[in-house]
A protein has these predicted regions:
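Extended interfacial segments that mediate partner engagement and assembly in macromolecular machines
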Residues: 1-84, 104, 119
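Generic structural signal for well-ordered alpha-helical scaffold segments
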Residues: 3, 74, 78, 98, ...
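Short, solvent-exposed loop/turn elements at beta->coil junctions and helix N-caps
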Residues: 14-22, 87-88, 96, 100, ...
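Solvent-exposed residues in well-ordered beta-strands and their adjoining turns
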Residues: 32-36, 100, 113-115, 349-351, ...
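Short, acidic/hydrophobic/Gly-rich beta-strand patch recurrent on exposed beta strands
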Residues: 44-47, 111-113, 241
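Short, aliphatic-rich beta-strand segments
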Residues: 99, 106-115, 172-176, 277
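Rossmann-like S-adenosyl-L-methionine
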Residues: 121-132, 136-375
């Protein structure tokens, strides 16, 4: 895609960051519930391009606890006559189960998504789930809409603080059911370490982190930068980001709620903020054009682009390179073993800052200065 869409023919690719252990690497899984042809409660995964559930209580990409947690939820449903959700009729209660685990802390989270306002006899579910070592947070999410979106807007906490914690490197993060947090923490540490390396921080820089989520990259950067500003559209993610900054004793980070393409121009035009480095980690649709234009206007020395979609990455790199930047290096990270998807991190530098540029030398003796003076 970088060649086909971006027109790049000579990109300096570095070796792919592969996975040492491509099994049991996912810290998050979401399982739909339903019934089979015999009317029995089943959970598993959707068949490709359908919403037909293939019964499967374990997956070698997920954590080992998933299987027994799902068995416990099914037991609770059967014993307490709680029906699974039926998409065709919009009847039934249990839609999905979300399970997360902190790889370094061992903390477990279970969030059950329901088609209703209340989970009956919820204490029975809590009792079953609390048998698992590391169970830290149990909640349910209310989602009564006819939608493919899994989580609802309202969360009800049943047990624990409503979140779990985990570490990437030596940075601690608070993770709620709604938090965006990379699903492969081992590879994430490699990815963010590379982004930090590309940022080239010496301690005196001002950095903007766009699409910052719960501050995962922001807090990595804050350890090496003078000041970091993070921007994220999801208010709860920013709440988590601010808590994460406090959790790590970092007071040189400031977070804004809003669209990157609106917050960045506003801060630049009204408050005259500047940036030595800008880091972007957008969703699959890539960066908004107005956001890219503001980046170009602010003219940071370096732009670090973290991407989960090579097509939109190619489009955005092409635009930045047409407006004064050059791709210095690109490196892919195998974040999703046994799939065709990778994360990519790119370093762009201002042309006059780039290592590769063209020098033009003019011989003053050969120039017609007389003509220039007459003008």
């Amino acid at each position: 895609n970088l060649r086909r869409i971006g027109g790049f023919t000579d990109i300096p690719f570095l070796p792919i960051m592969g996975m040492d252990e491509p099994w049991r690497y996912r810290n998050k899984a979401q399982f739909p519930f339903g019934r089979n042809k015999n009317g029995e409660i089943v959970t598993g995964f959707y068949a490709g391009r359908t919403h037909d559930i293939i019964p499967q209580e374990d997956c070698l990409l997920g954590v080992e606890e998933n299987k027994k947690i799902l068995e416990s939820i099914k037991e609770y449903m059967i014993e307490n006559h709680v029906a699974p959700y039926e998409e065709e009729t919009h009847q039934g209660l249990i839609r999905h189960a979300l399970i997360r685990k902190g790889f370094k802390t061992g903390e477990l989270m279970v969030c059950v998504i329901i088609n209703g306002k209340k989970l009956p006899r919820s204490e029975k579910l809590v009792e079953k789930l609390c048998r698992f070592d590391g169970m830290t947070s149990i909640s349910y999410s209310i989602n009564t809409d006819k939608t493919n979106v899994i989580l609802g807007k309202e969360l009800v906490n049943l047990y624990g603080p409503g979140y779990i914690t985990d570490y990437i490197g030596d940075v601690k993060y608070r993770i709620s059911p709604l938090s965006f947090y990379q699903v492969n923490p081992v590879q994430t540490e490699k990815l963010y370490g590379t982004a930090l390396e590309y940022a080239g921080l010496t301690g005196g820089e001002v950095v903007w982190d766009l699409y910052c989520g719960i501050g995962t990259i922001s807090l990595f950067l804050a350890q090496k930068a003078k000041k970091v500003y993070g921007v994220e559209i999801v208010p709860q993610a920013i709440d988590d980001a601010r808590e994460n900054a406090k959790l790590n004793g970092l007071d040189n980070v400031e977070f804004f709620v809003g669209k990157a393409e609106e917050v960045l121009p506003e801060q630049y035009e009204k408050n005259k903020v500047y940036a030595d480095v800008i880091v972007v980690d957008p969703p699959r649709k890539g960066c908004d054009e107005q956001c890219l234009n503001t980046i170009v206007t602010m003219a940071p020395k370096r732009v670090v682009y973290v991407s989960c979609d090579s097509a939109t990455l190619a489009r955005d790199l092409k635009m930045l390179c047409e407006k004064g930047y050059e791709v210095e290096k690109v490196r892919c990270c195998d974040m999703f073993g046994w799939t065709t998807h990778v994360e990519t991190v790119c370093l762009l530098s201002k042309l006059h800052e780039a290592k590769h540029h063209v020098n033009v030398t003019l011989d003053m003796d050969e120039m017609d200065l007389t003509a220039a003076e007459r003008r």
